Amino acid sequence: MSEFSERIVKQTEALLHFQHDETLQETTPERLHEALGQVIMMEISDNWTKTKRRQAPGRRAFYFSAEYLVGRLVYSNLFNLGILREMKAAFAEKGVDLACLEHIEDAALGNGGLGRLAACFLDSAATLDLSLTGYGLRYRFGLFKQSFVGGCQREDADDWTKYGDPWSHRRDKLAVKVKFADQTVNCVPYDMPVIGYETTTVGTLRLWQCEAEEELNFDAFNAQDYVKALEKKNKAEDITRVLYPNDSTWEGKRLRVKQQYVLSSASLQDILRDYRQEHGTDYYRLPEFIAVQLNDTHPAMSIPELIRLLMAEGLDFDAAFELTRRVFSYTNHTVMTEALEKWDLELLRSVVPEVCEIIERIDAKLKQEHPHTTLFIVKDGQAHMANLSVYMSTAVNGVAEIHSQILKDDLFKDWYAIYPERFQNKTNGITPRRWLGLSNPELCGLLDSKVGAGYLKHLDQLEGLKAGIDEMTVKQFNAIKLEKKRQLCRVIEEHEGVALDPSFIFDVQVKRLHEYKRQLLNALSIMDLYLSIKDGSIKDFTPTAFIFGAKAAPGYRRAKAIIHYVNRVADLINSDPAMDGVMKVVFVQNYNCSYAEHIIPAADISEQISPAGTEASGTGNMKLMLNGAVTLGTLDGANVEIAEQAGSENEYIFGATVEEINMVKPNYNARSFYKANPNLRRAVDTLIDGTVPTDEEQHELYTSLLEGASWHKPDQYFLFYDFDSYKKARLRVNHDYCDRIAFGRKCLMNVASAGKFSSDRTICQYAEDIWHIKPVK
């Protein structure tokens, strides 16, 4: 045991004794986690303070995001400090297995790829010694904790801080006030350290928690009006109670607007306070020192809010306007027009009247600047937040090459015609530290022997693996993959009660549940395979486990119906004795970052099946590629670049291209595909014909495919159009898997080609091309 690890263990023991009168051997995993976290926070505090002091005088970038999917921090922090293995051994000497911390809750601060991207970016910035600070919200209960009851999604509050939150520092003295039309709230920052890998830099993620100015109305309490006594407290805390509150009602929309305004106003007040401390009150120099990146449009209210704050400091509107448009840059994350955020002016006026007025003034300025164009920010009584972000930013970027091209050619083509210099591409990336080093140490052992150390900071070094993919290397890789499958089987049996066979192909689709991500296509295809195996039309089939993981938004009926249908398909197949040794289906509950760390290294097939032109990029595809899964996917998002890097012969690409979809879309007749394809028809009919139990929501899915639903046209996302192509690709990968050496070589080519998809590369490009910041050591 080294002196350092011995000190950590002793301090942890001392804290447990002081706080709980317990020994290491007597304590619970939760209390061990809290004590160890506090000790590590003390150990890094000096580097954290030094980092802040080094970065404060210079130019800095700030990342505004509604989500940060940071996952479980204890292992990743120990890993980035370079002491994970050492600490496991040190605690083992005391009879304590740090694997007990596997049961610690993930921090419930995000949901999908948007939040995980933000977390990866902060990790990369700290590792590269870049002055990037994250700002977000500290949600008391996150999105929700998912479970299945009778196959249906159930949502429960995710009480992730129930046993403490040792990785945050509450900073009361830095609290700020945020005013709405009907209330004023205290916003208290909680700082999370972002520990760089193999560096002394410790970045900061600052999260705001809303609290009441007055915790208790004592007069109301004495008058025994207990509801009124706590009314202000509850109303304030509601703002940061959950991520993405249901906004199907007026009050729900007001709460969403309040969330977004708190993120914007509190963060900007904090930034301006630091600016004044370092540079005084000469706000005309603000763009020299400050760059703010908007991660999608949730923080877009920052634009009018900065104008408002500068005007409150004495600047006139025109001066504040010109300064503001030199501070912000905007990352777009969707190509679907219906997903672009817009707010009714009446709604904004009822919550943030001053901000609403400034948005209208910005719109007037735009129309004055470009009187002969169709550009707008306000239209039909609505503020279009993406348009506001494009107009007021120095740079606008997509997150994959195909996505960025669609922004220029379609979504923002009128803006691109006037501001072509603003539009850039920054293909997303993932941190190799968490998604390879931490989650797959077995594969790292093989890579160390082939390309040497260093690839976790310079992922393009994996390219050197290509020359050495011989039969022995493939066999070593296959053995590692089998071990990761065995590990996942144990996790799934513990959490889901489903026993999987690790010798099966592991076919994985894990991502947010949305119709455009086409989990329903996957499920219908599985049903088709099942029925075809049963009737003998498919005779040779390599045994496969189909693994799903996804949460559906609480108010998204059809997404929840898809989950229920997948679970019904799973019940049918898993209870059929004829499918023993042939096929299994499992939908894991409460899929999150920590579950992903088990699933992704075990996957053989990465399902990336959204219709071309709908997924901005995706990052799950990159994580799966890095861990040696082949992509079964469309030419959408980053799939295009994955196939370019690894070679299309090492992926399984299917489906219509963007150009083909645009060509067929105007006259697309879903019913004609349904009628012409008996296998498709048989699979789709299982939604309603009693093959599996059905209900009103499942009938709605069926109707949405054949007749349309709400604003959707029939088969809005072209499941029928791509059905046969998907089936052929799926059967091809199923057949190819039998040649374990040839298939293993494809997998290793994916690992060796993943260098481009490091978030280190992405962050370097943001730093150089958009934020104009350099490393500060």
What are these regions (language model features)?
Residues 1-777:
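A conserved ligand/cofactor-binding region detector
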